[in-house]
Regions:
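Non-catalytic interface/linker regions that flank or bridge core catalytic/transmembrane domains
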Residues: 1-52, 56-57
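Signal-transducing alpha-helical linker
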Residues: 3, 23-26, 39-43, 87, ...
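A short mid-domain helix/strand-loop element embedded in enzyme catalytic domains
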Residues: 28-47, 64-67, 92-101, 147-148
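Divalent metal-dependent catalytic cores for phosphoryl transfer on phosphate-bearing substrates
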Residues: 48-53, 60-61, 78-142, 178
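Alpha-helical phosphate/pyrophosphate-handling elements in metalloenzyme active cores
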Residues: 55-86, 158-163
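Buried hydrophobic packing segments
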Residues: 69-73, 126, 130, 173
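Histidine/acidic-rich helix-loop-helix segments that form or flank divalent-metal centers
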Residues: 90, 130-132, 136-171
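Conserved beta-strand-loop-short alpha-helix elements that form
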Residues: 169-182
Length: 185
């Protein structure tokens, strides 16, 4: 688990901070290896609960969302190719957060209105990073739309039900689940 978080840190920072190519094959390979090391859903969720590293919250959270998304896709009978796309969507869903200053992102307590407005831009920042890359459109839509809600109350564009990509909806569920079960301040 810790090794894969280190991979996420390296791959995502190399892309966003150092402007290197996105090594999404490495993210997918390492995530799948970790996923298949868990024999059951219980073992997977137990690992997520017990192994979270608070200091690497963006990276641990991205890994967790990727693993949970893959499990949800398996339950929904996705094909192997669809599972890989969904796994990558989960892995990259918060890549835009790397464009937000660390002191804002890791601030304990509530954000100011200005800080929250900035944090709410991370889906758009992420989409802008990925839009020209040769990734499945579901990955890009999941990155952009994982905070959209079926009632139209989400962001960044306030999409509702049928306008939200299926992969984005699944990543959104995984994202909310992981956030709700995290020990965050």
């Amino acid at each position: 688990y810790s090794r894969v978080i280190a991979t996420y840190r390296t791959v995502l920072e190399d892309c966003v901070i150092y402007h290197k190519s996105l090594n999404y094959e490495q993210l997918l390979s390492d995530t799948k290896e970790l996923y298949y090391s868990c024999k059951t859903s219980l073992e997977l969720f137990d690992m997520l609960h017990n192994m979270r590293s608070v200091e690497d919250s963006v990276y641990a959270h991205s890994l967790n969302v990727s693993l949970i998304s893959r499990r949800l896709g398996r339950w929904l009978k996705f094909s192997p190719e669809e599972l890989d796309t969904l796994t990558l969507a989960g892995a990259l869903h918060d890549i835009g957060k790397l464009k937000i200053p660390v002191e804002v992102l890791n601030k304990p307590g509530k954000y100011t209105d200005e800080e929250f407005a900035l944090v709410k831009q991370h889906p758009k920042f992420g989409y802008d990073i990925l839009k020209s890359l040769p990734l499945d459109s579901h990955v890009k839509k999941a990155v952009l739309c994982h905070h959209e809600r079926s009632d139209g109350s989400g962001y960044p564009t306030g999409l509702s039900q049928s306008d939200i990509d299926e992969y984005a909806a699944i990543v959104s569920i995984a994202d909310v689940y992981d956030a709700m079960t995290a020990a965050r301040s």
